[in-house]
């Protein structure tokens, strides 16, 4: 059963480099599963992690895809632009939305929102003093 992201109480992270774990994570009882492209993925594996999630999304049913979020790499990293392109494809396949790490600037959230589309949930992570200072603008 899928619930709106805004009502989710539990989130489980799973590395995108291990698509064999996606089903287990979805069956864990967590309300939402966050497939991680950021910290759980080595730099050399970033492109493969995007492909793994894109391919895995094709094997999941609509209710399962609606419980998936993807944690992007932060803006300013070499992977951010490619993450946004892949995010657009994933949203077309019915994923719930994106987790935006190190959120500090409104234009970053706007870029993610543009790539993800109007129905996407965006969960900005405030991880720095700069993000905390900008929290009103980010809301």
Regions found by a protein language model. Name each.
Residues 2-139:
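Conserved alpha/beta-domain cores
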């Amino acid at each position: 059963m899928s619930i709106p992201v805004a009502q989710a109480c539990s989130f489980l992270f799973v590395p995108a480099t291990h698509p064999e774990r996606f089903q287990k994570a979805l069956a864990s009882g967590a309300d939402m599963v966050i497939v991680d492209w950021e910290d759980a993925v080595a730099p050399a594996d970033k492109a493969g992690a995007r492909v793994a999630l894109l391919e895995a999304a094709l094997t999941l049913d609509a209710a399962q895809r609606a419980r998936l979020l993807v944690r992007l790499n932060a803006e300013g990293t070499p992977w951010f632009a490619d993450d946004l392109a892949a995010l657009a494809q994933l949203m077309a396949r019915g994923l719930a939305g994106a987790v935006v790490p190190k959120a500090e600037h409104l234009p970053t959230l706007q870029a993610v929102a543009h790539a993800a589309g109007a129905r996407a949930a965006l969960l900005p992570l405030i991880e720095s003093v700069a993000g905390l200072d900008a929290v009103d603008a980010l809301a």
